Amino acid sequence: MRIEKIGNATLYLGDCRDILPTLPKVDAVITDPPYGIGFPYEGYDDSLENLDALIAGFMPWCLANAERVVVTPGISNVQRYPQAAWIGAWTWETTATFGKLGYSQWQPILFYGSDLPGFGNVNGIIKSDRIHFQGGAAKIDKSAGEVHTCPKPLEFMVRLIGRFTRSGETVVDPFAGSGTTGVACHNTGRAFIGIEREPKYFDIACRRIDDAQRQGQLLPAEPAGEAQQTGLALGP
């Protein structure tokens, strides 16, 4: 098992099901797991059977050892996860034709835990959490090389971490990918523990987080455009 320590970030190369049991209790888990989309990519067979095995392998540890757990499961997988305390959504508006063609323009967010600081003012979440993306697409930082196949936008992860964790807390991402959650933790003053099974993306994550810590905040400037992404809190 390879371990890299970069400032207040620690990254593990390996399977989260093997590594999570070796970690201490943490403040939060914030992660974007595989979606079970049904075909192999990046050396992993993303079948529903493998997704179910992953959920059974990582979620019990998260719920038992983290004060808060935030998961973006994919629109078709909510029922595969344990019942959440809250279900939220991130949505986007765009002038593109995706909506007209029947593609979803929202994704669910599952929130677990009784200590959820972001839900202190539900109306505030609905009205104020707006992140703008040019053309409705995620603005991905490619300065450190190739990024992950399915990354979340840095701005989105910064908003999620800032809303549902507190400064100085520790965030674990069992599916770290190219390190977006780790960069967002740096930008918001959180410690980070990331786990990634693919060596290529592990190396990219290490470089991106190292660059973020060397250069200070890497938050990209607010891009112009009509599209907007809105954080929306829904009831349990």
Where on the chain are the PLM-derived regions?
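Short, conserved SAM-binding/catalytic segment
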Residues: 2-6, 206-220
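Conserved SAM/SAH-binding loop
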Residues: 14-18, 223-232
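Short, flexible loop/turn segments with low-complexity composition
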Residues: 123-125, 216-226
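Generic signature of intrinsically disordered, low-complexity, basic-rich segments
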Residues: 130-134, 220-223, 229
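Intrinsically disordered, low-complexity and often Lys/Arg-enriched segments
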Residues: 234-236
